[in-house]
Amino acid sequence: MSQFWNDKIKSISPYVPGEQPKDKKYIKLNTNENPYPPSPNVIKSVKSMDIESMRLYPDPDVTLLKDEIAKYFNLTREQIFVGNGSDEILAFIFMAFFNKQDKVYYPDITYSFYPVYSDLFDLTEVQIPLDSNFEIKIEDYFGLDGHIIITNPNAPTSIALTLDKIESIIVNNPNNLVVVDEAYVDFGAESAVKLVDKYSNLLVVQTFSKSRSYAGMRLGYALGNSNIIEGLERLKFSFNSYTINRISIESGIESFRDEEYFQECRRKIMNTRDYTTTELQKLGFNVLDSKSNFLFISHITANASDLYQKLRDNGILVRYFSKPKIDNFLRVTIGTDEEMQEFIAKLQKII
């Protein structure tokens, strides 16, 4: 601690990211990274990058990438915001649209950055309990007196709401901003992007990190009413005009252009997820219905914390949360077929 820390820094509990081990090589199933490389077109773009251009600032408006995203979703450039990963965009949302002491509603079991942002920006967080099946009861979100953030599919539970349920929440909160964080939407859920033109109080956030194998490059984007997007732009240009580097912009464009590769990777991950689910159930695991690139699992007899440590000792990293209600669950990222076969083989010896 330093004498120069302000009161907020002294009191805040920062977000704890998943382990990125440096001591030895593990099968990494703990941070929901894509097991496959980016599109070959992306790799080619990076390798052919004009090094001389690195001395120049990138386009602060990220125009070409916005245009590519807008074309993909049949929106306009003015409806797209691009940030340095979706986490940055979420932080910008908390800063741009929520006043101090505003209420912000989200599930009690969800992305753990939300409480950090609520604390950091002096908001009143209201955590709405999931039901006994770890599902969101949409009626709990009707007619609220504050803004709403929903991760869909939810994390770490992996369960998705249908689009009609998302729309019901939006319709029943006409004066509140409804943010739908869709980091994992490409693995079987239905995106709310198609509702963007219909509702001015909807903001959808997506990322390149999961389905586009871009976690190391840091790219995310938001889609919404042009007036909402303008608010994000005003904040960004009051904070840091150049949040996206040249390599990310140029290669990100190529990622959106290679639809065939994108769909192929999605299919492989979802097929491997189905295989892994079946094998885990044979071993006595309860596996929640996943629409994500990970599984949320608990065993009928084995303790989750013990399983986490035994798997780690056997060279496999998964994610364990000590939070009440989910402290006997593990979150397991879907890797390659070979990685998941090894994961199952280790569990067969451990259980």
What is the meaning of each model-derived region?
Residues 164, 310-314, 319, 323-351:
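PLP-dependent enzyme catalytic core of the Aspartate aminotransferase-like
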Residues 1-56, 144:
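N-terminal "arm"/small-domain region of PLP-dependent enzymes with the aminotransferase-like
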Residues 63-103, 301:
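Phosphate-binding glycine-rich loop
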Residues 96-151:
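PLP-dependent aminotransferase-like
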Residues 131-186:
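Active-site phosphate-binding strand-loop segment of PLP-dependent enzymes
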Residues 201-281, 285-288:
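PLP-dependent aminotransferase class I/II
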